[in-house]
């Protein structure tokens, strides 16, 4: 009987702990969203007179990032590393492998597009001094922007679903990945890419696939290093190497693509990039077996 009471007590304590953590995570989502929605437009008004479209486009994410800092300090009472991974340290080698695999794949596709249709890839005209200034801004701001999006639209909601650890069973992991796919697709409904796309359905599928597959890999690895790396690699490649006409994040890249948006080629590139990431990071997926659903 004593053992049964002890077991029941531990289960009850675990349930209360999960409820408290879920509540703090949910409140953090609300707080970060409030900073983004309420203070984002204020940041845009303050930064717009500078005359740099890239800074103006990223202004709302500065507000979002501030909300995350406040949330970590006062609601979650934990470090960013503790939020981002179940491991004792942030796994920079894993982050680096995922980043390079995705970035390298994007570079190969750019080379393919240039060789198969040279007229679709133009050198972006801009003075060298402006490009160097843009380089400094992008290297600092873009990782902040992508990390902020990851926290709000992937890390916090997935943590709510999985509980204390990311090592959950298959059904739990499937639900968390589907939830992430939905959350990644919805905020992009207002993007220019959707209105200018040859097929808006393909663009939405692109965002959803990005949300689902990257979350699935993150859960299997026991941390969000892969998600943070892939998102940063994607946006840094767009901002620095090859952007496209009508981009939601205007920059001064080396090249500009005039290819149509929302084509099956876009999905093929995303799939190839994520397959490359999986191959580069597969050693991280051999984590201890999660409890069965």
What are these regions (language model features)?
Residues 39, 43, 67, 108, ...:
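Hydrophobic/aromatic residues in alpha-helical transmembrane segments
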């Amino acid at each position: 009987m004593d053992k049964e009471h002890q077991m029941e007590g531990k289960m009850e304590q675990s349930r209360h702990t999960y409820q408290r953590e879920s509540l703090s995570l949910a409140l953090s989502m609300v707080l970060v969203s409030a900073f983004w929605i309420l203070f984002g437009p204020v940041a845009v008004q303050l930064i717009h007179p500078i005359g740099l479209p890239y800074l103006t486009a990223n202004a709302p994410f500065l507000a979002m990032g501030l909300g995350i800092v406040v949330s970590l300090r006062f609601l979650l009472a934990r470090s960013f590393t503790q939020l981002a991974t179940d491991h004792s340290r942030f796994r920079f080698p894993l982050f680096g492998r995922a980043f390079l695999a995705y970035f390298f794949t994007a570079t190969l596709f750019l080379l393919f597009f240039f060789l198969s249709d040279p007229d679709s890839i133009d050198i972006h005209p801009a003075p060298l001094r402006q490009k160097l200034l843009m380089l400094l801004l992008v290297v600092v701001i873009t990782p902040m922007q992508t990390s902020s999006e990851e926290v709000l639209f992937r890390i916090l909601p997935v943590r709510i679903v999985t509980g204390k650890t990311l090592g959950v069973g298959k059904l739990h992991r499937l639900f968390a990945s589907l939830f992430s796919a939905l959350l990644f697709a919805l905020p992009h409904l207002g993007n220019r890419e959707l209105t200018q796309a040859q097929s808006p359905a393909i663009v939405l599928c692109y965002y959803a696939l990005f949300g689902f597959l990257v979350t699935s890999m993150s859960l299997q690895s026991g941390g969000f290093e892969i998600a943070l790396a892939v998102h940063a690699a994607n946006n840094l490649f767009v901002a620095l190497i090859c952007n496209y006409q009508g981009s939601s994040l205007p920059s001064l890249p080396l090249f500009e693509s005039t290819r149509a948006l929302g084509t099956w080629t876009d999905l093929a590139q995303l799939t190839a990039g994520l397959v490359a990431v999986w191959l580069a990071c597969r050693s991280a997926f051999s984590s201890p077996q999660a409890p069965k659903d």
